[in-house]
Design a protein with these regions (language model features):
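Bacterial N-terminal signal peptides that target proteins for export
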Residues: 2-12
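N-terminal low-complexity, Pro/Thr/Ser-rich intrinsically disordered segments
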Residues: 35-61
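Carboxylate/His-rich catalytic cores and anion/metal-binding grooves
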Residues: 205-228
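Selected transmembrane alpha-helices and immediately adjacent juxtamembrane segments
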Residues: 276-283
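Short coil/linker segments at helix-helix boundaries
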Residues: 189-213, 252-268
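Hydrophobic core
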Residues: 15-21
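Aromatic (Trp/Tyr) and acidic
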Residues: 16, 66-143, 151-152, 167-181, ...
């Protein structure tokens, strides 16, 4: 059940105060997901004309049965959405190969959409755990796209996503520095919060596949860095913002990588420090949140007072009303450091993220699909960023509602959305419905930032599966 708004706000205030009193260093998690989901679609009717109309646009026609097109985990909840002006009582799950009905059940009507004049219902077929390829059909409505049920769906998705990072990396250039740094930040955060998900894939002290790929990205950054100044350069022109990103990411990687190779980690830390000192000498304006991120990472990695002082000075001027990307990373780093922190500053900044997470949760209560926004109103990047915030805060406060929302985001991205589009595609495996190259380039599996964000979602889901 979703928390009532009034009770949530009281609970949030108590929680934030407890985090301040504890020094902002504690994080942990345990969840079991619940069913939540609705759908909102419009049925398009074709009208016959007595005279041919040559100037027209073909309307988009969307399926009335929505499923997770990338597939369901065998032991997880399995939900489909059904919409229509008139709905049948039952649904049937059909084996795609044999055409045998393997499961039947009653649909549950959730609401009536006044705009589309359609009922919205869901079918819960969680009891079906046998691996295979299926589709869902209903009388008078039709059938869904095919979907699979597998024991290792999430494991497969994680492997494919990490492998796709390697393919994407081949086409990177120095123009991509900021996006590369953002991706590395998300991936390392995922490892910091949900490392057990990746470590279980590692044998004989080899690097986790995720860290191995992140190292390759970091190596590319080091090759782009000017060895003399420590800055990112475009010819003779310094790239100040890119240099600030470099400072933060190299220090962050150094902190994580020291347990695998202390010598390489130290080299990254020295490169980060060199970039920071270069920026200190420049009379230029750089976003405070970005400098704050770099300072928090260098402080956590070195413990030096100069970085502690910079964190306090920069943090004091940060907005308490916005959730900015670099500020978010810096806040989570500062909250997790084992070194001395300014408890008041830490609590105030962490409160910004907690408040944003609660805003997303409240918006999700009004959304038919149980997430904080819609692909019709926001970009895929914005949807994934909201999910990244929820994934992080679920680790901080262990909230059953947040875990449910992340499941909803995962389903939404894979086809349980207004347009039935699967936004997850992998190189050489593009098989679904987005044809425009501009749109395809942003898909998970083809875009490194969005792929990193989706990996974060998967790591949160898989961590809870380990606990069950």
């Amino acid at each position: 059940m979703l928390l009532k708004k009034k009770k949530r706000n009281i609970w949030l205030a108590i929680l934030t105060m407890s985090l301040v009193l504890e020094g902002c260093g504690a994080m942990g998690g345990n969840v079991k997901s619940q069913i939540q989901g609705k759908s909102n679609q419009t049925e398009v009717l074709a009208l016959l004309e007595t005279e041919p109309i040559l100037d027209y646009e073909v309307p988009n026609v969307f399926p009335s049965i929505l499923v997770n097109r990338i597939g369901y985990e065998a032991g997880a909840e399995k939900i489909a959405f059904i919409t229509g002006e008139k709905l049948p009582v039952q649904y049937h799950i059909v084996n795609s190969k044999t055409r045998d009905i393997v499961l039947s059940g009653n649909i549950v009507i959730s609401e009536f959409n006044e705009k589309t004049k359609e009922y919205i219902a869901y079918a819960d077929f969680s009891t079906l755990t046998e691996e295979g390829t299926y589709f869902l059909e209903c009388d008078k409505i039709g059938r869904s796209y095919d979907f699979t049920i597998q024991e290792d769906t999430h494991e497969m998705l994680m492997t494919e996503c990490i492998n796709s990072l390697k393919d994407i990396r081949k086409n990177l250039s120095k123009e991509d520095v900021k996006e590369v740094c953002s991706s590395i930040s998300i991936l390392l955060l995922s490892y910091e919060l949900y490392g057990a998900v990746y470590d279980r894939q590692t044998q004989d002290n080899y690097l986790p596949k995720l860290i191995e790929e992140v190292k390759a990205y970091v190596q590319q950054l080091l090759e782009w860095q000017d060895t003399e100044t420590g800055a990112m350069m475009n010819g003779e022109t310094p790239l100040y913002e890119e240099t600030a990103w470099l400072t933060a990411v190299l220090a962050k990687f150094s902190y994580t990588y020291q347990k695998f190779d202390s010598a390489y980690a130290n080299a990254c830390l020295q490169a980060s420090d060199k970039a920071w000192k270069y920026l200190e000498k420049q009379d230029v304006e750089i976003e405070s949140g970005l400098l704050f991120y770099g300072a928090t990472e260098l402080y956590r990695a070195t413990g030096k007072y100069m970085y502690y002082a910079s964190v306090k000075e920069l943090g004091a001027g940060l907005s308490l009303n916005l959730v900015e990307e670099a500020q978010t990373f810096g806040t989570l780093t500062y909250a997790s450091t084992k070194r001395k922190v300014d408890v008041d500053l830490c609590g105030r900044l962490l409160g910004v993220l907690l408040n944003r997470a609660e805003q997303i949760a409240e918006q999700a209560q009004e959304n038919s699909f149980g997430i904080g926004c819609s692909i019709k109103e926001e970009s895929l990047e914005e949807i994934l960023w909201d999910a990244m915030i929820i994934s992080s805060m679920d680790y901080v406060i262990t909230n059953n509602e947040y875990a449910t929302m992340i499941q909803n985001y995962q389903n939404y991205i894979a086809g349980l959305n207004e347009t039935a589009v699967n936004f997850i595609q992998f190189p050489n495996k593009i098989q679904f419905d987005i044809d425009e190259k501009e749109e395809m380039s942003n898909l998970i599996g083809l875009d490194y930032v969005n792929t990193a964000s989706y990996i974060m979602i998967l790591s949160e889901i898989m961590s809870h599966e380990q606990e069950e």
